[in-house]
């Protein structure tokens, strides 16, 4: 179970849009046509976990819910800028239903287009489109398609931009304002879109620390030296859909809910709004983008015009909305390209019933996570005795959380993941104060200035046999862990490239904990075996975590996942089944007195019989010390 948390962190930590020194694109980088291919092992590690995909879907559902809540608001408040605070008047669509339209599509390197007489820049001209018509077109669904290859200029090869300017005009009109009698402002809808997409490619300069050699592509090293560690590269996708929303809602200026307000354009004079034009590239997978470079002679472009209903437009607008966490800084909470692709592929390829079941189960999974966290805090907060509990496992958990935090900081993971791991580390530190006596020694200061922290085992841990069994368990465990740790360190040093010695230490420790961290759960099993008791364990928390592990098992084999993640789920199951077996063979004796001096029989007597008024209750017979030891 602890190993799964580090695995999920690893999935997040590699999604930074980086390129490793061997020239392979990392999680945020798309595959290049004719360029170097990604390492298969790296591709396997980059696949996001099931819950990253599911949580991405749930986050989008939340955005959709927020938008729909805006539609359920009351009437708009009066605008103080209007005379006497009069309420704003609802507007209408400037293009009525079934309006005949002409479509003009111009391709230019200029963001502001004025050269309407240049026929070479007219990419597509489509006459007699019917606004809101769903039965015409090439396939009888209201859609029209056009394909053509664009000549690639030298400026575009050198990271220049390509813009598409589209104009919808009522039939018989022209988009050129200079054509008197053929142009009308209220009969022309204009929208501009940059066709190429700029992606950041970060070069990680790594090498073998012993030999100093690297498997990096010499071309990548040369580009890194000339452009720096971060390079902005123009990418291209050959498909784009132009949607005109079939909507005649009486929108009120200033009251359109976000993110829809970005697309509804009002005329300043009449107050009415233009038809909503939406460039739909949602189903363009990031892996299908390829870089624009000197090897390309032309760029293929397939444009599709389709009508779009209001509710589907709301869904797309919510999907493309900027994250509310952007105020924390760029890329704070933005999903990586592969995370976004995983959500889309799940929607496209997953059976609808399975997808619905996945969403429901993921909600249950989140509830179990919260309940496990709550019961874990309650257990340690109210715990009076440490008898039967492995204190060393708690201390090792702090070390493990610290390594994970330093690792994700070294790999520049996004801010939200860093905060979540840091909070987990603080909770682990808090557990230390519950299992050990922590105090400040102001007499023996460090360098005579800083008070020294003193850690001392609690008496309930030292005076019982638990400490002996705990030390014995970690002694046996060290016989296995130290050789494995040494072998893994040598392997990482010989065969894996690193940025430096500090990164090697962190990645080596992190990889070792990810692979063998589950072994640290076994000392508690040994203590249970020696004490012949499991009554001291936080069973509620363990049960919730086990249920989550079983859910992970189910979807790890249903959803495409890395094999190491599947193995991690299964090995955690093995440990928990051993816990269940111990609970079955070491049944709780109701006559056994716990650390509070009460037993199950006492509670049953208290509930069935109450002493009479003025009668002194019978004293509780103290159990022998040998019987208390197992509680």
Swiss-Prot record:
- Name the UniProt key words of this record, in alphabetical order: Developmental protein, Differentiation, Glycoprotein, Membrane, Transmembrane, Transmembrane helix
Higher taxonomy:
Eukaryota, Metazoa, Chordata, Craniata, Vertebrata
**Function, please?**
Involved in GABAergic but not glutamatergic transmission. Binds and traps GABAA receptors in the endoplasmic reticulum (ER). Modulates postsynaptic GABAergic transmission, and therefore inhibitory neurotransmission, by reducing the plasma membrane expression of these receptors. Altered GABAergic signaling is one among many causes of cleft palate. Might function as a lipid scramblase, translocating lipids in membranes from one leaflet to the other one.
Q: Where in the cell is it found?
A: Membrane
The name on file for this protein is: Putative lipid scramblase CLPTM1
* Entry keyword annotation includes Transmembrane: yes
Query: Which stretches are Cytoplasmic in the membrane topology?
Result: 374-388, 436-475, 522-631
Which gene is transcribed and translated to give this protein?
clptm1
Per the record, the domain of life is Eukaryota
């Amino acid at each position: 179970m602890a190993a799964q948390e580090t695995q999920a962190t690893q999935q997040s930590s590699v999604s930074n849009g980086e390129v490793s020194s061997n020239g392979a694109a990392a999680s945020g980088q798309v595959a290049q046509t004719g360029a170097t291919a990604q390492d298969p092992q790296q591709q396997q590690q980059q696949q996001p976990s099931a819950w990253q995909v599911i949580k991405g879907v749930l986050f989008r559902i939340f955005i959709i819910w927020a938008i729909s809540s805006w539609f359920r608001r009351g009437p708009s408040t009066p605008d103080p800028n209007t005379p006497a605070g009069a309420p704003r008047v609802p507007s209408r669509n400037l293009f009525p239903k079934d309006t005949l339209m002409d479509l003009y599509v111009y391709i230019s390197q200029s963001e502001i287009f004025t050269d309407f007489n240049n026929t070479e820049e007219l990419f597509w001209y489509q006459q007699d489109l019917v606004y809101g018509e769903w039965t015409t077109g090439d396939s009888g669904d209201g859609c029209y398609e056009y394909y053509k290859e664009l000549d690639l200029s030298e400026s575009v090869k050198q990271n220049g931009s390509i813009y598409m300017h589209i104009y919808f005009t009522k039939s018989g009109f022209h988009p050129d304002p200079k054509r008197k009698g053929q142009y009308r402002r209220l009969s022309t809808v204009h929208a501009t879109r940059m066709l190429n997409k700029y992606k950041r490619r970060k070069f990680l300069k790594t090498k073998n620390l012993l030999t100093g050699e690297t498997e990096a592509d010499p071309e990548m090293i040369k580009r890194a030296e000339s452009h720096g560690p971060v390079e902005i590269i123009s990418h291209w996708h050959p498909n784009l859909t132009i949607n005109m929303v079939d909507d005649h809602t009486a929108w009120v200026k200033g009251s359109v809910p976000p993110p829809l307000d970005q697309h509804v354009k009002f005329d300043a004079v009449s107050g009415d709004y233009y038809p909503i034009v939406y460039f739909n590239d949602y189903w363009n997978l990031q892996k299908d983008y390829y870089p624009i470079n000197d090897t390309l002679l032309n760029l293929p472009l397939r444009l599709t015009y389709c009508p779009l209903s209001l509710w589907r437009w709301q869904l797309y607008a919510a999907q493309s909305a900027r994250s509310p966490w952007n105020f924390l800084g760029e890329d704070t909470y933005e999903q990586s390209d592969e995370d976004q692709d995983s959500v889309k592929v799940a929607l496209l390829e997953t059976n609808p019933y399975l997808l619905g079941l996945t969403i429901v189960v993921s909600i249950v999974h989140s509830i179990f996570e919260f309940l496990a966290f709550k019961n874990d805090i309650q257990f340690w907060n109210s715990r009076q005795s440490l008898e039967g509990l492995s204190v060393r496992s708690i201390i090792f958990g702090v070390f493990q959380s610290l390594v994970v935090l330093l690792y994700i900081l070294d790999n520049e993971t996004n801010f939200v993941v860093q905060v979540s791991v840091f909070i987990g580390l603080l909770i682990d530190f808090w557990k230390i104060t519950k299992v050990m006596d922590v105090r400040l020694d102001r007499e023996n200061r460090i360098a005579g200035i800083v008070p020294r922290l003193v850690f001392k085992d609690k008496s309930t841990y030292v005076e019982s046999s638990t400490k002996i069994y705990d030390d014995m368990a970690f002694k046996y465990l060290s016989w296995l862990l130290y050789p494995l740790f040494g072998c893994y360190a040598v392997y990482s040093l010989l065969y894996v490239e690193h940025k430096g010695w500090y990164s090697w230490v962190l990645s080596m420790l992190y990889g070792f904990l990810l692979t063998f961290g589950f072994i640290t759960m076994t000392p508690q099993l040994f203590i249970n075996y020696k004490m012949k008791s499991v009554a001291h364990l936080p069973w509620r928390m363990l049960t919730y975590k086990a249920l989550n592990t079983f859910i992970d098992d189910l979807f790890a084999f249903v959803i495409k996942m890395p094999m190491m993640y599947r193995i991690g789920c299964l090995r955690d199951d093995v440990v928990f089944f051993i816990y269940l077996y111990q609970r079955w063979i070491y049944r709780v004796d109701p006559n056994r007195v716990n650390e509070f001096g009460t037993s199950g029989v006492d509670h049953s007597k208290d509930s069935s019989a109450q002493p009479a008024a003025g009668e002194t209750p019978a004293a509780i017979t103290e159990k022998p010390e040998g019987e208390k030891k197992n509680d």
